[in-house]
Amino acid sequence: MAGAAAASAAAAAVASGISARPVAPRPSPSRARAPRSVVRAAISVEKGEKAYTVEKSEEIFNAAKELMPGGVNSPVRAFKSVGGQPIVFDSVKGSRMWDVDGNEYIDYVGSWGPAIIGHADDTVNAALIETLKKGTSFGAPCVLENVLAEMVISAVPSIEMVRFVNSGTEACMGALRLVRAFTGREKILKFEGCYHGHADSFLVKAGSGVATLGLPDSPGVPKGATSETLTAPYNDVEAVKKLFEENKGQIAAVFLEPVVGNAGFIPPQPGFLNALRDLTKQDGALLVFDEVMTGFRLAYGGAQEYFGITPDVSTLGKIIGGGLPVGAYGGRKDIMEMVAPAGPMYQAGTLSGNPLAMTAGIHTLKRLMEPGTYDYLDKITGDLVRGVLDAGAKTGHEMCGGHIRGMFGFFFTAGPVHNFGDAKKSDTAKFGRFYRGMLEEGVYLAPSQFEAGFTSLAHTSQDIEKTVEAAAKVLRRI
């Protein structure tokens, strides 16, 4: 997408991000069909059918707190920002999750993004079983790496070469070292509320779990690790210009989520991404899109295809592993040839490119290539967001929100929300009450106001209707 089309897409995204009645952004040419029908059991938490209880979750979680810090292996799972009992899950399938107490939920977390074709997809699972028969990890080259690399390179406009790693954090760490090695500069610029993993240099005014815990950064991060990290408010071109003027010729790269998902759902304002592209080129800095969340979700070629802006380097994760641990960073060939063993910038990983993650990624991307995928995601997600916001308006709650394709979010504030400062005006106490009420109604949302939500090809119109009905019920109650 370029020119007028890109401007139109950006305008649509902004409208959807801040309006009480968002207009769904118009998709670029879609590549995949609507989902196969899936037979599912009815939700079993309706009043009169089954009392909602999480006793087993509580028992297991209490035991976990004696074994793992806070009882979890990622902070947001502990429900610190929403209150109530963290849910311990037993199984997933399609758009549904079941906890250890037998409660069923319509899921809008999707394992934090990877489950775009639905949980435990039969085709992906069958392929994994066949790969498993040959081994779980080689610690050596395998042909599946070539296959997935070719798919990623053909899909993502900025990527001419790619390096696979094991997480989004690793991908951003590799990209950070790479841009510094290539430019010979040390400073980076990131945006308030944008989360690029838990590497030291990025834990400055980060969103996501750091925002949830109310910490501006983290103990244990030395001042030297963040002294070269500059920050600006997202969507603020003038602030970026000022930082470039004050640090002329010193900034290695600008890192950003092209659509913020770790401070809630915040789309770019018209012209913002274009301005970053121009400013980095003028100064000799690189532009890095962190597409760990948006890659293959907003379009087959990610946010950069959707908005028509090509960065120099991109990071990926989540979807390209189909639910298995994975990450990747890639970019122009001349930049990527700095990476060892082709070049002097060292980065390595024992399990990088392992056959199971490559297999899941290959078959997930194959599904996304089918005609109709992104039109379908756009429709169901738009119906969901409009339905929830309409319910909020009818019950007297100040809310705003929006979506792009299969990514969405809403805030308990009138808005508009253009940056992390705006997002923090949301009534997080009310969100907590809403969240706990939705759990009781059989809907699982991200347990933080500062996280985007996700739909999948497994979600049906009936799922959306049930969710909107549940939201209306809870909003009336709170």
From Swiss-Prot:
Question: Which pathway does the protein contribute to?
Answer: Porphyrin-containing compound metabolism; protoporphyrin-IX biosynthesis; 5-aminolevulinate from L-glutamyl-tRNA(Glu): step 2/2; Porphyrin-containing compound metabolism; chlorophyll biosynthesis
Region (Disordered) location? 15-36
**Enzyme kind, highest EC tier:** isomerase
Please name the InterPro entries in this protein's record: 4pyrrol_synth_GluAld_NH2Trfase, Aminotrans_3, Aminotrans_3_PPA_site, PyrdxlP-dep_Trfase, PyrdxlP-dep_Trfase_major, PyrdxlP-dep_Trfase_small
Task: List, in alphabetical order, the Gene Ontology terms for molecular function in this entry.
Answer: glutamate-1-semialdehyde 2,1-aminomutase activity; pyridoxal phosphate binding; transaminase activity
Q: Where is the transit peptide?
A: 1-40
Record PTM N6-(pyridoxal phosphate)lysine, positions in chain? 318
Cofactor (UniProt): pyridoxal 5'-phosphate
Q: How does it assemble?
A: Homodimer.
Protein name (Swiss-Prot/TrEMBL):
Glutamate-1-semialdehyde 2,1-aminomutase, chloroplastic
